[in-house]
Amino acid sequence: MSIRIGILGYGNLGRGVECAIKHNPDLELVAVFTRRAPETVKILTETAAVYSVNDAEKMKDKIDVLIICGGSATDLPKQTPEYAKMFNVIDSFDTHARIPEHFDSVDAAAKESGHIGIISVGWDPGMFSLNRLYANAILTNGKDYTFWGKGVSQGHSDAVRRIKGVKDAKQYTIPVESALEAVRNGENPDLTTRQKHTRECFVVAEEGADLAQIENDIKTMPNYFSDYDTTVHFISEEELKRDHSGIPHGGFVIRSGKTGWNDENNHVIEYSLKLDSNPEFTSSVLVAYARAAYRMNKEGQSGAKTVFDVAPAYLCAADGAELRKHLL
């Protein structure tokens, strides 16, 4: 019998989840919930239906896992605990500093209802977090490094779009090659924010806008650009559509450490991602963890979980014997 999946929110992430379900025969999409008028939302799966979010509670016996595809700033802190009262839930909450409090609120709701809520699933947090944990457990004497990119940062692109005189924009985060090489060589450098990444902006300005002012507003923006070397390019709307319409991303998690009685041997563990579509990859991770949530809940587990709490075998459609035979 298929694991029945619901999607809450049908933007880039929700559409990505729908595509990922197509590639997982043991999963079945039964419902998409939206804040928009349901009749205006066209989905790709003919056997599923679109409902208003207000109807979610009526579906709680028809859905095994609800994948919540909202934003981390305002949606997920409310939605994940709320829907954990009705369903097993998965989210991609990625505000790193606020993960502990988000975990606690989801944990309380999920324990009370007997459901599981796996939070902060994706690639960072998510796959990168797992690789940090494995590397730290193995090389206890060492240093962690995370590099992001080259890729489009949605949050930074939005921040540029909010500047007066900006019609549209894309921002790329780019690792500094010399810093990456130093880490890979086991040099264990101490790197500042500015030494690890640069930022590159492609901006379509409103007609008659002050370009020098826009560039200054970008480069001096606190929390986003002021700590980085930033390059700003002004381009036409056509160029932006033609050359910058994708949502690629990726990055590297590296731990460099020493072993031996006198720390005489160096080791470098590296995990990297190169993604054509950030939301579609994130969605694929969410779907694997939906399978895990269903299985863990069937075993009687409840409460909030993170990727650290999920044994790898729960993620795969294959059973233990198959995994031991083919992947071990």
Language-model regions: role of each:
Residues 4, 15-16, 23-54, 152-290:
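C-terminal substrate-binding/catalytic lobe of Rossmann-fold NAD(P)-dependent oxidoreductases
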Residues 10-11:
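Glycine-rich Rossmann-fold phosphate-binding loop(s) that bind the pyrophosphate
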Residues 127-143, 158-168, 292:
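Oxidoreductase and adenylate-handling cofactor-binding alpha/beta cores
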Residues 267-328:
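NAD(P)-dependent Rossmann-like dehydrogenase/reductase catalytic/cofactor-binding core
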